[in-house]
A protein has these predicted regions:
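A short, basic/flexible loop-to-alpha-helix module at the beginning of a structural domain
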Residues: 1-10
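Short beta-strand-loop/turn "lid" adjacent to the catalytic site in phosphate-handling enzymes
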Residues: 43-46, 61-95, 123
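Short, well-ordered amphipathic alpha-helical segments that serve as non-catalytic structural scaffolds
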Residues: 50-64
Length: 124
């Protein structure tokens, strides 16, 4: 199952996040200069080949968006070894979710995330 969305960027500052889960790889690119406008997203099953899946996602992103100022980070249950091999920053997924939720929803009290291998609950 794949889901892609692509729009054209207006600026060079792009935030790219890749979530490597137990069964899928998700990538999203946001315009950091224009209210985090969605520029690119993709979702694909990795069939237990996380590194190849991440590389494919990055190549797909780069084929659509040719920018120089890209900030990239990996998260997810399968991302730590991939980040080490590719020398890309890693943020633990519960921490990443907590930071994003508190930034977007200042009054959030509880968050529940259902993943492919586990479920997580965050209390603020």
């Amino acid at each position: 199952m794949m889901n892609k969305e692509i729009t054209k960027p207006n600026e060079q500052n792009i935030l790219v996040g890749i979530d490597v889960g137990s069964t899928t790889t998700k990538i999203v690119a946001l315009d950091a200069d224009h209210d985090h406008q969605l520029l690119f997203s993709d979702y694909a099953r990795h069939h237990a080949n996380q590194i190849a899946s991440v590389i494919k996602s990055i190549k797909e992103f780069c084929s659509h968006i040719k920018q120089k100022k890209i900030r990239l980070c990996l998260t997810g249950s399968g991302a730590k070894p991939v980040s080490s091999i590719l020398k890309v920053p890693f943020v633990q997924e519960v921490a990443a979710n907590a930071i994003a939720l508190q930034d977007k929803f200042q009054k959030v009290g509880t968050a529940i995330e259902l993943g492919g291998q586990d479920a997580k609950m965050i209390f603020f």
